């Protein structure tokens, strides 16, 4: 009988992204586009995160806990996992739910920039994270913005020529 075949209700892009390791739209994005996208999204959420931190101290505590765990990371894999977690938590802390879709960019970024992350001075990254969240907690969005931009832009210096 007609209508008795297979029906697909919906596709869960989160599961597809998890399986593929990236959202299909991010497959051919250049390294500079990834950096620019991260700067735009992550610097853009900072005023919202600062405002939310004033209302909810646990946001700072969660970000600080991730950063403390980064200090204990001894392998590149663990470092990348925690660094992604930090930046994802920062975006999520904005409570701007449409931007949470951009957290896929983080996984793609760290996969593509693995060599850059290897060469980066991890302690500088940790201290940069700390300056960002401390500035946000104090309500100094401009300082946090400057630090975030420098933090992400530093990967340009390590791009292959």
Please report, for each region that a protein language model flagged, where it lies by residue.
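Short linear motifs at protein or domain termini
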Residues: 1-41, 47, 161
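Conserved amphipathic alpha-helical segments that form helical-bundle/coiled-coil interaction surfaces
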Residues: 34-115, 125-129, 143-154
